[in-house]
Structures are given as C-alpha cells and as structure tokens.
Amino acid sequence: MDKTLSREEAKQLMQLLCLDMSCWGNLPLMRRQYLVKCKEYHPDKGGNEESMKLLNSLYLKLQDSVSSVHDLNEEEDNIWQSSQIPTYGTPDWDEWWSQFNTYWEEELRCNESMPSSPKRSAPEEEPSCSQATPPKKKHAFDASLEFPKELLEFVSHAVFSNKCITCFVVHTTREKGEVLYKKLLQKYQCSFISKHAFYNTVLIFFLTPHKHRVSAINNFCKGHCTVSFLFCKGVNNPYGLYSRMCRQPFNLCEENIPGGLKENEFNPEDLFGEPKEPSLSWNQIANFALEFDIDDVYYLLGSYIRFATKPEECEKCSKNDDATHKRVHVQNHENAVLLQESKSQKNACTQAIDRVIAERRYNCVTLTRKKLLTKRFKKLFNEMDKIVVGERKILLYMASIAWYTGLNKKIDELVVRFLKLIVDNKPKHRYWLFKGPINSGKTTLATALLNLCGGKALNINIPSEKLPFELGVALDQYMVVFEDVKGQIGIEKQLPSGNGVNNLDNLRDYLDGCVEVNLEKKHVNKRSQIFPPGIVTMNEYCIPETVAVRFEKTVMFTIKRNLRESLEKTPQLLSQRILHSGIAMLLLLIWYRPVSDFDEEIQSNVVYWKEVLDNYIGLTEFATMQMNVTNGKNILEKWFE
C-alpha cells in the first residue's frame, strides 16, 4: 500500500472517508465507506462538489495504483520457475543469476565487484556441501480459465444470437456441476443429460425437448453461479461433442440414459426441437400475383383468401368450367388457410405486389416493345378462354366488331397503324389525337385500344403542381391515354375551360420521347425513363401550334346518330363493358386481318379463334349485324328477342 498514494494523499483520503489511519489498507472497508460518502458529498444530495471531486480522484488513483502493484507482483512471480535453476557455481548459474536480477528495481541493484582472493593450492578437490534448491511441484492445470479447446469445433461461437436450439453444453466448477446437473434436468425436462469431468471442472451436456436461446440457459445457470465461473454454449454437432467428451482428457461421470447415446439414436426432434409447424409462404402468394399480373393489394388479398375454402366446397371448382381456377385453388388452399390466420396479411400481399412491379420493370427494360405487345396478346388469349365461352358471348363480341365497323369503315387498318406507331415508338411520332364533339366515340375507341395494349389513363386537367404524381402513374406502362383534355378556347362556347392544353404544352419532352424524363410516385424514388406513347382525346378546343405538331395523326370524330341508337337498343355492349374491352379489339383484328399479320408466337391462337368465330357466325350473319348498326336497330335483333 506504500506504493499506491503519497502520505499526504493517503491522509486526505482517510479524512474524506472519515476513517482512522489504522484502517489504511483495509480495501473492503474503504470501499463501503466510499459508497456511503459518495451519497453524502454528491451535489444532487446537497453535498460539497469540491469534496466529491477530490474523493473521486483520490479513490480512483488508489484503485489504479493497487491494480498496477498486483500486475507487477504477477510479473515477478512468472519470471522464473525453480525447475529452471541451473547448478550453483556453474557458468549457467551465473548467467541465470544476472538475468534474474534485471527485474528488480534499479535502486536495489548493486554493481560492486568483490576483490579476487588469492588462489590456494588444492591438491585434491573437496566435495561440495551445497546443492541447488529443489524444484517446486508444478501447479495442477486450471481448466476454469477458458472453454476446452478440444470442444471448440463442435459448438457455436456466436456472441449475440436469437437463434433457438435444443442442444447445449455448460462448463463450470465441480461443486456447481453437481447442483446444475439436477437443476437443469428438473427445469427443462431434458430428454438426455450427461456430466463429464475435465481436470478440476465439470461439463454438462444436455438435450431439451423444446427450443431455447443460449442466453436463456446462461441466465438460468448464472442464478446458481454468482461466484463460480460459467461457460454456456450452443452445440452445432451434438453427437460429435458427446463422443469427444467420452474420451480423454474427459471422463464420463453420469448420464440419465444408461449406455449413453449412439449416433443413430438422434431423432430430428432431439436436434431441432419440435417438428416445425407449417408457416405462411410469402413466395407462393407472390407467384400467384405474378401469374395473374395482379398489382392491387386488396384485390390480391381478397382473391387469395377465397382459396381458404376447401376445393370440394368451392362452387367454381364443382362446376368444372374453369380448369385454371381449380388448379390454382388446389395449389394454394393450405397457404390461403395460413394467410387467413396470419396477422401480416397486408404485408405479405404488399411484398407480392412489389414482385409484380419488379417483374414489370425488368420486362420494360430488357424486352423489346414488340415482345411486350406479344406478351400482352397472350394474356388476352388466356382471358378469352375463360370469358368468351358459348354462343351468346361470341355474338356479343361480334356485335361490338360490327359497331366499330360502323364507327370507321377501315377500323382494322386504323388499329394496325396505331399498333405500329406504339411498337416503333419513334421520337416525335408517338401520339395520336382523337378530336370531336361530345358522344362521338373518341373515349370508347381510345379505351379499347388502351385495354388492348395495356396502360393507364391520365387526367392532366389538374393544377400544374399536382402533375408530377399524376404523370408518375405512367411508370413502367406500355402506353397512356390523356383523357378528355380541356382547353381555354373552344369552337363551341358551352365547352368548359381547363388547364389540360396548357399543361400539355408544358410536357413537350414527355410527348416527343427524345429524352428521358423523371417520373415519381409517393414513397418511391424518382426514376428516369422515356415517357410512354399514347393517345390524347379532347373535344373541339383550339390547339396551339406547339402542341399540334407533336401529334403524328389527328383522327376527327363526328356524331353518328345510328351508332347511339344501336347502342341504346343493345345495352349489353355497355353494361358488360364489351365495347371498351381489349378482347373486342383483339377479336376485331382476328376477324379482319390475315394470320400472317400476327407474331409467330401467337399465330396458333389466331387460327383457333378464327375457326371458333367461323363456327358461330358467317359473313352473311355479320353483314346483318352491320345493317342493324347502320339502321340504328338492335344489333342482335335476329338472335336475341
């Protein structure tokens, strides 16, 4: 203690601790008094701040000094061992003695040299009466310093892990090993437990019927080892660890199963806990959304939960009308039951929608526009197999073709030219303008073309500050329709005014398609892409020259009374949205165009549907439909009363 603090500092510290100097060196007493005085001197308790600072500095200095002295003593003890002392009087002993003295403090060294004594003649060597100090016995190996190196390859080395496992090994003293062996067996109902001696310590190996974290086992054991050392580890190779602890330097003490364990006796439940309960497969939901191209969270959730009903109790499955539905229902029934019970239904469906958007983004970047259109047609053909079933449905779709023929005699050429426009997507030749009076068929045709190719309709009659998010809807879309654009000045005074034409004039880069533009959605980062081509529909507004030159073609519409009357008398075309569907446009192309006009990948589908249409309606019947349209009659008057 004399090497820790100076005499004056020691007196100051003892005065602050209110202890007599006779107690100097009684570290436990000084520690207790220090904690008491900290509460007394602390400024928050009304004490003296200066006294508190002085007490802390002196006490911390004392602690550091005591630690340094202990370290020095340990170094001195470890300099040499008695077994290493050479024989006294030999040159080796002189060298060892010189090395031994180098560790002592400088002031204790003595560099004096003794005067040499006169040599005396010795006819005979007398036997030496001195001998070296006998070597001390080696201390027994202390196995409590670290976990046995022989077992490191079998255990987990994770420091912080939430993984739950069923196999553990605990390393502690012999005394605590006796206690923990019984406590662990009782607490965790171990399916197997064994105790192994390792020098002066004990290892306990055990398997639990249920999964636990290593930290939970460690905390339980610490409650019984407040002073004794403790190592607790999870086991990666249970049988390898157990068999190694049955060989030297380990000794098997006891185990709850006579004869121990053999490698083939380990069941999966022993190693991995209880059989894993089936969990909700988010990937299966995503695959379903990808197959049917669903990008609406709530529609996906509603559709998928329907599969929770048993297939044998499902009306659609029992009718056998839709083979695809029955296949998908059987595949997804078990997962749908889990989704129904899950608390993360929306999260699972949101991730599935993200997969759909990611797939769409990938296709937009990697596939050509012709390939994308072919893929869209394939999807429509799949829908036709489910929707266009039976004579009544086919006649309704043929009636829509007759109506479009009445709208434009060369409707097929118009559609083919438009498809070529959006497939080529040439800069400054990407947009058509549909212009005409109210109820002249502009929106009907534009919507059908939009559904044929796939895309979104946009409203740009809104204030300019709201435009960025409206335009962001066009992200990854094949085409767009700027619907019912309003201008400031119209040929007819009763037309309402709006910001549409003015906003369109400010979107020249969007219409031209020469450079990439930034598109953004809420909660999504901006992305640069060429804005998709499309159609602009408007009434008879005046268009500035800067906007007009950006339209590759302007299609003028006029009011045809017979078209309106035939629709009124054939309400199914509107109520069932047949006239606005992409299927109607695709059937129109199949009816009018030769097979060679279609891509080779879908020519077989085109041939099939041409045969289907020919079986239900011939040229004479179709001519009758056209005549009914021209006369403003019910298009299906001959077939439906």
Curated annotation (Swiss-Prot):
Keyword Transmembrane (UniProt): no
Zn finger intervals (T-ag D1-type): 277-369
Phosphothreonine found at: T133
Post-translational modification: Phosphorylated on both serine and threonine residues. Small t antigen inhibits the dephosphorylation by the AC form of PP2A.
One cellular component (GO) term of this entry: host cell nucleus
Cofactor binding, note field: DNA helicase activity requires Mg(2+).
Gene Ontology biological-process annotations: DNA replication; symbiont-mediated perturbation of host cell cycle G1/S transition checkpoint; symbiont-mediated suppression of host innate immune response; symbiont-mediated suppression of host JAK-STAT cascade via inhibition of JAK1 activity; symbiont-mediated suppression of host type I interferon-mediated signaling pathway
Sites bearing N-acetylmethionine, chain numbering: M1
Domain SF3 helicase: 410-572
Region (Disordered): 114-136
Catalytic activity, reaction form: Couples ATP hydrolysis with the unwinding of duplex DNA by translocating in the 3'-5' direction; ATP + H2O = ADP + phosphate + H(+)
Motif LXCXE motif location, chain numbering: 108-112
Top EC class for this record: isomerase
Entry-annotated residues carrying Phosphoserine: S117
GO molecular function: ATP binding; ATP hydrolysis activity; DNA replication origin binding; helicase activity; zinc ion binding
Residues holding ATP: G436, P437, I438, N439, S440, G441, K442, T443
The entry's DNA-binding region: 148-263
InterPro entries, alphabetized: DnaJ_domain (IPR001623), Helicase_SF3_DNA-vir (IPR014015), J_dom_sf (IPR036869), Lg_T_Ag_polyomavir (IPR016392), Lg_T_Ag_Polyomavir_C (IPR010932), P-loop_NTPase (IPR027417), T_Ag_DNA-bd (IPR003133), Znf_lg_T-Ag_D1-typ (IPR017910)
Compartments in which it is found: Host nucleus
UniProt motif Nuclear localization signal: location: 134-141
Keywords from the UniProt entry: Acetylation, ATP-binding, DNA replication, DNA-binding, Early protein, G1/S host cell cycle checkpoint dysregulation by virus, Helicase, Host nucleus, Host-virus interaction, Hydrolase, Inhibition of host innate immune response by virus, Inhibition of host interferon signaling pathway by virus, Inhibition of host JAK1 by virus, Interferon antiviral system evasion, Isomerase, Magnesium, Metal-binding, Modulation of host cell cycle by virus, Nucleotide-binding, Oncogene, Phosphoprotein, Viral immunoevasion, Zinc, Zinc-finger
Transmembrane segments: none
Main location: host cell
Subunit details: Forms homohexamers in the presence of ATP. Interacts with host HDAC1. Interacts (via LXCXE domain) with host RB1; the interaction induces the aberrant dissociation of RB1-E2F1 complex thereby disrupting RB1's activity. Interacts (via LXCXE domain) with host pRB-related proteins RBL1 and RBL2. Interacts (via C-terminus) with host TOP1 and POLA1 allowing DNA replication. Interacts with host TP53, inhibiting TP53 binding to DNA. Interacts with host preinitiation complex components TBP, TFIIA and TFIID to regulate transcription initiation.
Role description: Isoform large T antigen is a key early protein essential for both driving viral replication and inducing cellular transformation. Plays a role in viral genome replication by driving entry of quiescent cells into the cell cycle and by autoregulating the synthesis of viral early mRNA. Displays highly oncogenic activities by corrupting the host cellular checkpoint mechanisms that guard cell division and the transcription, replication, and repair of DNA. Participates in the modulation of cellular gene expression preceeding viral DNA replication.
Descriptive protein name: Large T antigen
